[in-house]
C-alpha cells in the first residue's frame, strides 16, 4: 500500500500519558462476524468497530481548546513531545454524524466526505473483541471471507480491508503512559511506517512536524510506526490488488525520520519494512476483462461480491470470488517463467524479475511474512484518497511517465490525470464502501456456512463455474493442484487431486482440493 490514508486528528494526555477526554461519549458501533470450524459450521461473534485515534478531536485536558488545528500544532499546548502529551487528550467519536460510519448487523458502511461542524474525509476502523481490545486473527492455515460493495468508488478512491501486526491493546501494556488504548483506536502501524500519526507509543509526534503542502489536515512528524501488513483488499470499481508486505521486525516499532522508509520518507527503501509488497492485481498482470463495472467483466463491480483469501501453511496465498452464485478462481497469470494463480515464492520472484524492484525479497519475502501471519493480526477497514500519488499505483499507469509497453506500469484503466483528492472530494463526496458478512476459519470452512449456497450469492437455476484454463496431463487424466478447484456445477476441469489432498465439496458450485 503506497500510503494508508490521509489522516485528520489525534490523541493523548495527562502526565506524559495518552489518555481520553469525556466531552464526547465513546460508543463503539456494533458489528457481528462469523467464526467457522473445519466442518463448515459457523457461529456468530458479537464485535464492534472503533475509529483510529488520528481522526479524533484532540484538545486540552482542562478545556475544549484544540491541541491540533488544521495541520498545525498549538505552540502553547504542544511545544514539544512530552509537554504535548501532558496537556492534551483524545475524545470520543460521533461515528455517523462526524465520520460517516454506520453499522447494521454484519455490515459496515464508510462514507467518503461527511460535513458536520468540520469536513471529514474517509475513515480507518478496527474490529474489536471487547471494549478495550482489538480482535486478533491468526491467518496462517486459515481463510478469511467477506462481502464488499465497491460500486460507489470511482478512480482515485481505495476501499481497503487489511491486517496489521499492531498490539491488541493499542500499546497499553508496552507503553503504560498510554491509558486510552484500543478503546480509542491507538497503536496503529503498517508497512509504510507512517509518520503522519500525531502520537506514537504514548508520545506526541510534534517535534519535527512539517504541515502538508497539499492537504489542510495532515503533516509529517519526526517519527513513524512500523509493522507487517497484509493487504487483503485494496480496491475501487476499476482495480483491485492483494499484497503482503513483510518487515524484518514483525510487530509494532517506532522509527526515526527518513530512516523509516516508505511513502512518507525521502529514502523509500531505507526502513525495516517493504513498502511495495508482492502484489496481485489482475489488470496489471494482463487480465483487463476480469474486474470492472458492467456485465462485460467477469466480476461486475456494480454488484456486491464475496472475496475469499486462503493462507497456506507453506506461505502461499490463494484467492477466489463468488458473485451471483458463481465461483471464480483468481485468474491465471503468465509472468516470465511463472504460470499459475497462487501468490507464492515463484510468483513473487517472477514479479520482481519482470516488473523490477527487490524490496519484497530484501525484507525476507513470504518466509519472513509467515512470521506475521502465524501470530495475531488486527483487522483494518478503511476508505481513503491519496495525496501522494492520486492512487495511480492502484488503478492507472504508474509511474506516469511510463507507457503500456513498460512491464507492470499499467495497473488499471483510469486516466493518469484522475484521482486528485481535491477533485474527488468535490465531485464524489457521496462515495462509500460497504463491508459485510465477515467469516474466518480453517481453509475450506467459510464457503459452506450458508446452508450449502455459495457465500454472498443465491443459487440460480443454471450456472456455470468459470475458471482459467489449466494445463492437461496424459491419461488417466489431469490432476488438480493442492487448493485448486476440483468440482462444482458446470465445472469441467481436473477432478483428481494431487497426492496428499482430496476433493471436498464446499458448496454446489465449488469443490476444492484440501
Swiss-Prot record:
It comes from the Eukaryota. Glycans are attached at residues 62, 81, 287. InterPro entries: CBD_sf, Cellulose-bd_dom_fun, ConA-like_dom_sf, Glyco_hydro_7, Glyco_hydro_7_sf. It is an enzyme of class 3 (hydrolase). Its EC number is 3.2.1.91. Residues 401-427, 444-481 are annotated as: Disordered. Residues 454-478 are annotated as: Linker. The keyword Transport does not apply. SUPFAM superfamilies: Cellulose-binding domain (SSF57180), Concanavalin A-like lectins/glucanases (SSF49899). Disulfide bonds join 21-89, 36-42, 67-88, 78-84, 155-414, 189-227, 193-226, 247-273, 255-260, 278-348, 486-503, 497-513. One of its GO terms (molecular function) is cellulose binding. Residues 18-453 are annotated as: Catalytic. GO terms for cellular component: extracellular region. The keyword Hydrolase applies. Keywords: Carbohydrate metabolism, Cellulose degradation, Disulfide bond, Glycoprotein, Glycosidase, Hydrolase, Polysaccharide degradation, Signal. Residues 478-514 form the CBM1 domain. Pfam families: CBM_1 (PF00734), Glyco_hydro_7 (PF00840). It catalyses: Hydrolysis of (1->4)-beta-D-glucosidic linkages in cellulose and cellotetraose, releasing cellobiose from the non-reducing ends of the chains. Residues 1-17 form the signal peptide. Coiled coil: none annotated. Residues 460-479 have a biased composition (Low complexity). The active site is at 229 (nucleophile), 234 (proton donor). GO terms for biological process: cellulose catabolic process. The biological conversion of cellulose to glucose generally requires three types of hydrolytic enzymes: (1) Endoglucanases which cut internal beta-1,4-glucosidic bonds; (2) Exocellobiohydrolases that cut the disaccharide cellobiose from the non-reducing end of the cellulose polymer chain; (3) Beta-1,4-glucosidases which hydrolyze the cellobiose and other short cello-oligosaccharides to glucose. Belongs to the glycosyl hydrolase 7 (cellulase C) family. This is Exoglucanase 1. It comes from Hypocrea rufa (Trichoderma viride). The gene is cbh1.
Amino acid at each position: 500500500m503506497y500510503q494508508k490514508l490521509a489522516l485528520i486528528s489525534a490523541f493523548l494526555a495527562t502526565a506524559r500519558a495518552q489518555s481520553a477526554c469525556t466531552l464526547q461519549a465513546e460508543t463503539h458501533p456494533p458489528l457481528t462476524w462469523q467464526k467457522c470450524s473445519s466442518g463448515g459450521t459457523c457461529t456468530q461473534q458479537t464485535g464492534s468497530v472503533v475509529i483510529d485515534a488520528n481522526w479524533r478531536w484532540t484538545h486540552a485536558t482542562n478545556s475544549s481548546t484544540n491541541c491540533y488545528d488544521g495541520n498545525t500544532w498549538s505552540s502553547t499546548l504542544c511545544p514539544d513531545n512530552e509537554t504535548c502529551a501532558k496537556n492534551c487528550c483524545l475524545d470520543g467519536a460521533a461515528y455517523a454524524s462526524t465520520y460517516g460510519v454506520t453499522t447494521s448487523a454484519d455490515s459496515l458502511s464508510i462514507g467518503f466526505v461527511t460535513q458536520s461542524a468540520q469536513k471529514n474525509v474517509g475513515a480507518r476502523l478496527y474490529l474489536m473483541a471487547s471494549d478495550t481490545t482489538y480482535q486478533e486473527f491468526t491467518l496462517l492455515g486459515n481463510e478469511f471471507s467477506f462481502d464488499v460493495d465497491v460500486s460507489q468508488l470511482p478512480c482515485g478512491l481505495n476501499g481497503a480491508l487489511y491486517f496489521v501486526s499492531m498490539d491488541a491493546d493499542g500499546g497499553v501494556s508496552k507503553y503504560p503512559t498510554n491509558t486510552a488504548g484500543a478503546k480509542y483506536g491507538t497503536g496503529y502501524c503498517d508497512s509504510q511506517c507512517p509518520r503522519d500519526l500525531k502520537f506514537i507509543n504514548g508520545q506526541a509526534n510534534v517535534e519535527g512536524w512539517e504541515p502538508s503542502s497539499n492537504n489542510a489536515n495532515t503533516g509529517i512528524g519526526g517519527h513513524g510506526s512500523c509493522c507487517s501488513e497484509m493487504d487483503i483488499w485494496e480496491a475501487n470499481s476499476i482495480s483491485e490488488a492483494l499484497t503482503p508486505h513483510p518487515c524484518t521486525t514483525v510487530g509494532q516499532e517506532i522509527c526515526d525520520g527518513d530512516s523509516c522508509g516508505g511513502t512518507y520518507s525521502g529514502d523509500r527503501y531505507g526502513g525495516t519494512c517493504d513498502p511495495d509488497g508482492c502484489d496481485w492485481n489482475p489488470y496489471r498482470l494482463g487480465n483487463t476483462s476480469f474486474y470492472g463495472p458492467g456485465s462485460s467483466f467477469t466480476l461486475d463491480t456494480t454488484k456486491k461480491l464475496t472475496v475469499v483469501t486462503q493462507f497456506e501453511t507453506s506461505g502461499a496465498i490463494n484467492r477466489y470470488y463468488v458473485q451471483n452464485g458463481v465461483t471464480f478462481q483468481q485468474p491465471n497469470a503468465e509472468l516470465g517463467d511463472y504460470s499459475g494463480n497462487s501468490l507464492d515464492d515463484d510468483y513473487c520472484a517472477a514479479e520482481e524479475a519482470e516488473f523490477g524492484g527487490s524490496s519484497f525479497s530484501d525484507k525476507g519475502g513470504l518466509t519472513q511474512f509467515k512470521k506475521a501471519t502465524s501470530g495475531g493480526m488486527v483487522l483494518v477497514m478503511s476508505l481513503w484518497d491519496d495525496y501522494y500519488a492520486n492512487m495511480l499505483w492502484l488503478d492507472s499507469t504508474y509511474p506516469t511517465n511510463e507507457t503500456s509497453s513498460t512491464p507492470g506500469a499499467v495497473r488499471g484503466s483510469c486516466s493518469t490525470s484522475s484521482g486528485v483528492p481535491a477533485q474527488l472530494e468535490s465531485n464524489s463526496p457521496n462515495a462509500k464502501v460497504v463491508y459485510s458478512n465477515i467469516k474466518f476459519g480453517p481453509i475450506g470452512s467459510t464457503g459452506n456456512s450458508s446452508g450449502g449456497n455459495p457465500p454472498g450469492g443465491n443459487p440460480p437455476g443454471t450456472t456455470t463455474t468459470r475458471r482459467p484454463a489449466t494445463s492437461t496431463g496424459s491419461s488417466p487424466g489431469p490432476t488438480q493442484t493442492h487448493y485448486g478447484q476440483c468440482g462444482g456445477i458446470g465445472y469441467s476441469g481436473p477432478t483428481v487431486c494431487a497426492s496428499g489432498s482430496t476433493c471436498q465439496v464446499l458448496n454446489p458450485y465449488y469443490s476444492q482440493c484440501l
